[in-house]
Amino acid sequence: MRSRKLTGGVRSSARLRARSCSSTSLASAGDIASSTSAKTTCLASSSHKATDRRTSKKFKYDKGHLLKAELQKVDPKSDISSLPKVVPVAPCENKFAEDGAEAAVPAPENTAPPQGCSKPVSEEPSVKAEEGLPTAPRSAAAAQETHDSSASQAEPVPVLQMDSSVFLDDDSNQPMPVSRFFGNVELMQDLPPASSSCPSMSRREFRKMHFRAKDDDEDAEG
């Protein structure tokens, strides 16, 4: 009986050991799995960060290229330099060249000059030379007329300055504005002087008459 009990105890202890070993192995396997999962998550996050950095770098590079392309499109100097330069041609030169080409071929004489390149020549000097009339006096008369007209324009026209006040200051020695009471002064200046009814007398005669009148008054009072 004791041997059976011992064998049963040995068996039970072996079973317990096997169970404990299996539990420890399971725990270690769980720890390993958790560590591997943590490692995988760290690797995944690091890979995501690396991909984000790469995409941001690519985006910045693409942006820089787009900006450069837009600047090259907007820059007007490159467009102007690429265009061919056109040299302006004067119309008179072309007409002179055509006239030279026509002169090589015999053609009837044209009295009218080309339009826009030369002024028509007046025929008055030739007619005057044929008639034998002098041209200098006419030019002198024209110069005198121009001089007289310029002198008349240069002379200032007198402007009548009207005073705004009816009576001037009492302290001033200036006369009253006549235009306020008698109208336009310029019309009065052209009138002839008024003729006096009595003959003019000298100052001495006037004084003598004055003193005589005084003496007569005194005699009458006395």
From Swiss-Prot:
<feature type="compositionally biased region" description="Basic and acidic residues">
    <location>
        <begin position="121"/>
        <end position="131"/>
    </location>
</feature>
<comment type="similarity">
    <text>Belongs to the UPF0688 family.</text>
</comment>
<dbReference type="GO" id="GO:0005634">
    <property type="term" value="C:nucleus"/>
</dbReference>
<dbReference type="InterPro" id="IPR031530">
    <property type="entry name" value="UPF0688"/>
</dbReference>
<feature type="modified residue" description="Phosphoserine">
    <location>
        <position position="172"/>
    </location>
</feature>
<feature type="compositionally biased region" description="Polar residues">
    <location>
        <begin position="33"/>
        <end position="48"/>
    </location>
</feature>
<protein>
    <recommendedName>
        <fullName>UPF0688 protein C1orf174 homolog</fullName>
    </recommendedName>
</protein>
<keyword id="KW-0539">Nucleus</keyword>
<feature type="region of interest" description="Disordered">
    <location>
        <begin position="98"/>
        <end position="158"/>
    </location>
</feature>
<keyword id="KW-0597">Phosphoprotein</keyword>
<dbReference type="Pfam" id="PF15772">
    <property type="entry name" value="UPF0688"/>
</dbReference>
<feature type="region of interest" description="Disordered">
    <location>
        <begin position="23"/>
        <end position="57"/>
    </location>
</feature>
